[in-house]
Amino acid sequence: MKKLAVVAVGLMISGLVGTAQNKLKPLISSTNFTTKAQLWESIGSGILNYQADVMYIYGKLYVTPLMPDSANHKLPTLTDAYLYPLYNQFKKNNGEIVPGYPDDVYLILNLNSSAVQIYKQLALEMRPFAEMLSFKIDGNEQKGKLRILIKDKLQLEKINSVKPGFLGLVGNMSDVDKNVDSSVMPLIEVDFNEITSWKGTGNIPFEDFTKIKNLVTKVHVQSKKISIINCPSYKTIADLVQTSKIDFVTTPEATRMAGFFEIAK
């Protein structure tokens, strides 16, 4: 029975991933995955970018925003839930996480304990998967397929003050006019409520749509991508994303939102 289950999972993965590049969704899933199967299913649904809470606990990185109550916890490790399944796809597809997808996959980490300690452990845990990473350090660039980012500028400064590392930064609205190098800050994240008071019902006011279009253009001119957060999970939002050329919606309801996007032609 166990062998049959393994075969079934393998067939599901190969079938779903084989068609994923034809239906990629402009989404970043902010749900903390607990198993590698969740990530594979996400890829099969066309959701390729992820955000996860990470904590250093007794020599390993775990996917959690909070310290567990017991040493006998069942929390997933970052390697099991994200790094290994992504690398599995990378190797199986000859250096591509999804065949034909030209861009980096983003893994955004929220660091919930000492940033330097987490980074040192992450560097150790990434060693078997190092060829998959995209980064630029002191002028040396590696073009892999996975870009690991964090949001906290002070955390990144602390990490890089010890030794320049492979992490990139997610910017925010205040960074749009700073023109930070896209190799350092490839993604700008904007709170939906900062750019419109529209709640996703009816039509978005034209002046708000124009403002959003101009913002997207300004970000794209810098060779960066833009994601919106804290927006309703409605089809009207999917329509706005497609018409305004927003790159991503970051949401804990990525599976629901995926159903609102048409299959890419």
Task: For the regions a language model picked out, list residue spans one by one.
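Phosphate-group recognition and catalysis centered on beta-loop-alpha active-site segments
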Residues: 20-265
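Bacterial Sec-dependent N-terminal signal peptides
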Residues: 1-23
